[in-house]
Amino acid sequence: MSNVVVIAVVLIVASLTGHVSAQMDMSPSSGPSGAPDCMANLMNMTGCLSYVTVGEGGGAAKPDKTCCPALAGLVESSPQCLCYLLSGDMAAQLGIKIDKAKALKLPGVCGVITPDPSLCSLFGIPVGAPVAMGDEGASPAYAPGSMSGAESPGGFGSGPSASRGSDAPSSAPYSLFLNLIIFPLAFAFYIFC
């Protein structure tokens, strides 16, 4: 009888693990479905870190030569990822402190036109208002008309990433992997115990 109880508990835990991980992927606090793609996109912008970070390794007067092309590519392919950069949440997860004032100056310094940061609130990512630009004379290159009120948040980015709801990573492979491990272990435990 105890073997049946153990197997039942293992099966319930395995089922709940898949259900909980699926719920975590869909929780509003994790952001839009494109959020996981943003981490990879933001990693391409490491050349900008010396300019936009605070503390050791940061505070450069101008961005590295790889920064501006990376920013232009990010704006073209996944402009919503800029919201994650400006919010500082992803950087904080990596232990990086972003100077929001310099991050907001970056498009002007690079000569890249970006959507207005206030549009990030449409994704549920508040980034605050743009700050006054310093004496560098670089103003933010925002395209305030880049999204009319009639457009949905999916229209924020015209690139492929904005319409890839179906490409968002899911918990299915993780759940399948867990189930492929737990079920044979439970079966072996039942047979040998």
Curated annotation (Swiss-Prot):
Tissue expression as described in the entry: Up-regulated in the epidermis of top stems. Expressed in roots, cotyledons, seedlings, leaves, stems, buds, flower and silique walls. Preferentially expressed in the shoot apical meristem and the root meristem. Also detected in expanding leaves and petals, developing flowers, and elongating pistils, stamens and siliques.
Deleted gene: phenotype: Reduced cuticular wax load on the stem surface and in silique walls, with altered cuticular lipid composition (especially C29 alkane) associated with diffuse cuticular layer structure. Increased susceptibility to penetration of the epidermal cell wall by the non-host mildew fungal agent Blumeria graminis f. sp. hordei (Bgh). Some early aborted seeds and infertile ovules, and increased salt permeability in seeds.
UniProt keyword annotations, A-Z: Cell membrane, Disulfide bond, Glycoprotein, GPI-anchor, Lipid-binding, Lipoprotein, Membrane, Plant defense, Signal
Lipid-bearing positions (GPI-anchor amidated glycine): G165
Gene Ontology molecular functions: lipid binding
Compartments where found: Cell membrane
GO biological process: cuticle development; defense response to fungus; lipid transport
Keyword Membrane listed: yes
Short name of one Pfam family: LTP_2
Signal peptide annotation: 1-22
PANTHER family associated with the record: BIFUNCTIONAL INHIBITOR/LIPID-TRANSFER PROTEIN/SEED STORAGE 2S ALBUMIN SUPERFAMILY PROTEIN-RELATED
Protein name per its UniProtKB record: Non-specific lipid transfer protein GPI-anchored 2
Lineage of producing organism: Eukaryota, Viridiplantae, Streptophyta, Embryophyta, Tracheophyta
Encoding gene per record: LTPG2
